[in-house]
């Protein structure tokens, strides 16, 4: 693929993720949009890593590191959402203020 196509795809994924993160009222949807943003960043990392020096795997290794951190973030985020849903019976962001108990 050409560099412009990959960058356009990455920018498109990033903008969809930002839009979804800003407009989302559901916590699970917000977590999914955050994962979409991280995947767009990973696509850029791998693309530029192969563009500048395809023999070194710095971008690929950093991308695997970001994927690992994103998996941990998703697990912790879903555990928090599950706990909030158990206590509040809702996963809406505006109803999740736990300080108003």
Curated annotation (Swiss-Prot):
This protein's UniProt keywords: Chloroplast, Membrane, NAD, NADP, Plastid, Plastoquinone, Quinone, Thylakoid, Translocase, Transmembrane, Transmembrane helix, Transport
Gene Ontology biological process: ATP synthesis coupled electron transport; photosynthesis, light reaction
Catalyzed chemical reaction(s): a plastoquinone + NADH + (n+1) H(+)(in) = a plastoquinol + NAD(+) + n H(+)(out); a plastoquinone + NADPH + (n+1) H(+)(in) = a plastoquinol + NADP(+) + n H(+)(out)
Assembly with partners or alone: NDH is composed of at least 16 different subunits, 5 of which are encoded in the nucleus.
Function field: NDH shuttles electrons from NAD(P)H:plastoquinone, via FMN and iron-sulfur (Fe-S) centers, to quinones in the photosynthetic chain and possibly in a chloroplast respiratory chain. The immediate electron acceptor for the enzyme in this species is believed to be plastoquinone. Couples the redox reaction to proton translocation, and thus conserves the redox energy in a proton gradient.
Annotated PANTHER family: NADH-UBIQUINONE OXIDOREDUCTASE CHAIN 4L, NADH-UBIQUINONE OXIDOREDUCTASE SUBUNIT ND4L
Protein name: NAD(P)H-quinone oxidoreductase subunit 4L, chloroplastic
Primary gene name: ndhE
């Amino acid at each position: 693929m050409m560099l412009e196509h990959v960058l356009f795809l990455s920018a498109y994924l990033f903008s969809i993720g930002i839009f979804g993160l800003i407009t989302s009222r559901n916590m699970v949807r917000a977590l999914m949009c955050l994962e979409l943003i991280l995947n767009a960043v990973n696509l850029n990392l791998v693309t530029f890593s192969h563009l500048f020096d395809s023999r070194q795997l710095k971008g690929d290794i950093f991308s695997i590191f970001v994927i690992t951190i994103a998996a941990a973030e998703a697990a912790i985020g879903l555990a928090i959402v599950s706990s909030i849903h158990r206590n509040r019976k809702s996963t809406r962001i505006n109803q999740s203020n736990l300080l108003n108990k």
